[in-house]
């Protein structure tokens, strides 16, 4: 008797559902993508109990006739591809013909659909089997209702998370689809409460406002770049607006939301040292390319894709982001708190003019608390020989009735916990407001006249635009980082011979790795010579190694090689420069002379990125004259 048998269709569909339908969010994703493929302009999604009780998706798309409706629930039945050549030219979101039969096999499903010509079709299925077929109204479009999800797969139901978590997953999926298709009006409701409403006018900024709040959307900069193979566009948040999770970084390829680590890496490299360690930006990157350059047939969920010419795309995105920030003045301006106006309803957000001036969200007391709170002690400077006090500028008339944004910001897939978007302590000014196109990098930071030092840590300076507070350690870190970044690698002509060679010892396994990368280590100034089993000596080092730190620096660089196992010379030089700049910079509670402060500010202005230290912390904070006068009630 034969041992190998062909599985029945209902069992095959359940197996396929294990990959396609992982949770209620998977059902929502597949149904909404089908609606978009049907050229819908309006999609309404209603879920009960985070989709475990019911999911209903209603669209105004092309609909289906009775025959197509029945065929759609057969395995691998689709209208989107005809032959294997179409697999390499996929322009639709779906094409595998697995979603509907997989969903139907693990639920009770009802579908009403019509092409708008004649009566429609109403099918009812249980566990993938059609149990009734009736006529339906001729309204053009499709309505699918899924209930009792996973009723016949209790093991899958057992591993569902809490209602909040599953709803968070659904919200995350719908948010990303809405970003990828701003031309479609999408409404998501849970238990009758609207969670997302987009107007479908094609402007992705309005979708960003609906998802992240208007204050965040107004602080996002447009991004555009082209090459022979790729067209990249989207919006990237100013560096001050960060999150602890990567879930706020959305990438879309040919209208399909994807997860791709190399793209995330390219975005981080574009921000470079503008981001604090462990923080991630809010970004939306849309990439259009020839379908031949992307393989979407990698996984049934179609979230993972393979990209051709990935290195070229990586460089295009990274350089485009860098170019955007090179044109911006990124000095954060602290704003005076003001009374919070009533909340704006989500649908009204779609009507906001993005060119209007807005005040940032108000600061709470906790936002401005400092860990270091001694009695004020200022070291005053005699400035009469340097510069006269700038004349007080007339306060600029500002719109006082601008509504503050306190809209909730929907989280990513980890947990659904709606809460007000946190106020950013130091919101930068709207991009491009104070920056002229013809400015050089030196003019990105204005000339500042020092007036003192606070706690031996912060430099106070002024000009006609107000007060500036400079973190002296972060400022010198940036200066030294850019110096060392240029010096690392220029080692051949600038070396210091040692009277007594430095000796280093490693295990046999570590020595094998080091031996493979001796040439790479030499390129960053570490000249190792074998000195027995697992031992090495260094007879010279670059003259720019910080004095007294030579042994530590060499050990740290070698450890980077041992940790990574593979060498990226550019990355190694970068890490070495960051390490040396941090070790050699002035620390807190270090009082500087007047001439030292002036020299430090002049050197900072000459750096290419004078706004953050190499670790992403801000260097300069700005209080405008208007805000100072407002705090002292000189203006109301």
Curated annotation (Swiss-Prot):
Residues 341-420 are annotated as: Disordered. GO terms for molecular function: ATP binding; ATP hydrolysis activity; ATP-dependent DNA damage sensor activity; mismatched DNA binding. Gene3D superfamilies: 3.30.230.10, Histidine kinase-like ATPase, C-terminal domain (3.30.565.10), MutL, C-terminal domain, dimerisation subdomain (3.30.1540.20), MutL, C-terminal domain, regulatory subdomain (3.30.1370.100). Pfam families: DNA_mis_repair, HATPase_c_3, MutL_C. Residues 348-358 have a biased composition (Basic and acidic residues). This is DNA mismatch repair protein MutL. SUPFAM superfamilies: ATPase domain of HSP90 chaperone/DNA topoisomerase II/histidine kinase, DNA mismatch repair protein MutL, Ribosomal protein S5 domain 2-like. One of its GO terms (biological process) is mismatch repair. Belongs to the DNA mismatch repair MutL/HexB family. This protein is involved in the repair of mismatches in DNA. It is required for dam-dependent methyl-directed DNA mismatch repair. May act as a 'molecular matchmaker', a protein that promotes the formation of a stable complex between two or more DNA-binding proteins in an ATP-dependent manner without itself being part of a final effector complex. It comes from Bacillus licheniformis (strain ATCC 14580 / DSM 13 / JCM 2505 / CCUG 7422 / NBRC 12200 / NCIMB 9375 / NCTC 10341 / NRRL NRS-1264 / Gibson 46). GO terms for cellular component: mismatch repair complex. PROSITE patterns: DNA_MISMATCH_REPAIR_1. Keywords: DNA damage, DNA repair. The keyword DNA damage applies. The gene is mutL.
